[in-house]
A protein has these predicted regions:
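N-terminal pre-Walker A segment at the start of P-loop NTPase domains
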Residues: 1-19
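Globular "head" domains of long coiled-coil molecular machines
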Residues: 17-355
Length: 355
């Protein structure tokens, strides 16, 4: 995984942009809070449903949008290294093998359980099903059940499940086949003059029409099968024409849609993951998005606590999303009561929060 400084160095070398005088904004929020909807409204891309999102799937690769005068449309995607992708696949296969073994201990024979473990990681950050065909996943789940399970079924614990040399051989073949499926899916994306895993940024440019540019990005970065998001480490999308019509035409900014809060249990419980703090340092403002009906609970409240404790409170602004879901006639009063409840909760953590 690339460090934040490495990412910025690569992007600077690729674009040669001077962003020193432009306001930089970091979007933060729990899964389903409405960050992606906010980005769509700022970019004027609602009719294209871009960026794509679902109710339960959160942003994985941080995506940076740059709006600047005289800037042509361009997308730069930094991809993960081959070994990192391979290791992530191996972790999924290991979990699928352990699930097959667990099921065998309670006389449960469920191929779907094994396949589900292959589809994506528990935290949702690595979704193999975005680049591996359904029939391949089912076939490899079957290999685990029919070829590996008989070799490990009698084990008393799962610590040594994968030590058997025959198990290792079959497992490595499964990983190899899954990896090849990823490569084949990538080839079908029709990206000219680019070799996967050669260490260079993937660049989409020379598209002058906003609709064509957005649709090409949507094709590559969608949330379902045929997307390359699985491989993406960081994404930069730039262009003067990205701005929605309702915003001032001379507006310039960098907007970073960060990973959603709540990928890890610790983040849901109390503190923010350290991956956010580089962005806090880099950006001028932190916009924390929360659903109006239940704002800033769980991970959201923990995020506010972490921001205050670590001295970033001067950068923090709160945004209520999905206000159309409020049935109360006095929406302002409703939201103020919600904030008052948040203030009371933070006081218990000895954090002074002014509404």
């Amino acid at each position: 995984m690339l460090s934040f400084n490495s990412i910025k160095t690569i992007l600077d070398q690729s674009s040669n942009l001077d962003l020193s005088e432009i306001k930089k904004i970091y979007l933060l929020g729990t899964t389903g809070a409405g960050k992606t909807s906010l980005v769509r409204n700022i970019l004027g891309t609602n009719k294209y449903s871009f960026p794509t999102s679902t109710q339960t799937k959160t942003t994985i690769a941080p995506t940076e949008y740059i709006v600047k005068k005289n800037l042509p449309f361009k997308t730069t995607i930094l991809l993960k290294e081959k070994n990192e992708v391979y290791d992530s696949i191996e972790l999924l296969v290991d979990e699928a093998i352990k699930k097959a073994w667990d099921n065998s201990k309670v006389n449960k024979n469920n191929l779907d359980d094994i396949k589900y473990k292959l589809e994506e990681s528990a935290d949702g950050r690595f979704r193999l099903k975005q680049m591996v065909r359904e029939d391949t996943l089912k076939e490899k789940a079957g290999d685990i059940e029919t070829k590996i399970l008989p070799l490990i079924k009698e084990h008393d614990d799962n610590e040594s499940l994968l030590d058997n040399i025959d198990v290792k051989t079959i497992k490595n073949n499964i990983i190899k086949d899954l990896f090849e499926d990823i490569e084949n899916t990538f080839l079908k994306l029709n990206i000219d003059n680019y070799k996967l895993f050669d260490g260079t940024p993937l660049i989409i440019e020379n598209i002058h029409n906003k609709e064509d540019f957005i649709l090409r990005n949507k094709e590559l970065l969608k949330t379902d099968f045929g997307s390359l998001v699985l491989l993406a480490e960081y994404i930069r999308i730039e262009g003067q024409g990205l701005l929605a019509d309702w915003l001032p035409a001379n507006l310039e900014f960098v907007l970073i849609d960060g990973e959603g809060i709540g990928h890890s249990l610790s983040e849901k419980r109390d503190t923010l993951s350290v991956r956010h703090y580089d962005f806090f340092d880099y950006c001028n403002q932190i916009l924390l998005v929360g659903k109006a009906l239940e704002p800033f609970i769980a991970g959201g409240q923990g995020a506010i606590e972490s921001i205050y404790i670590n001295g970033y409170n001067d950068k923090l602004k709160l945004i209520f999303s999905k206000t159309d879901e409020i049935k109360n006639n006095d929406k302002t009063g409703f939201l103020r009561r919600q904030l008052s409840n948040l203030e009371d909760a933070l006081e218990k953590q000895k954090i002074s929060f002014d509404i």
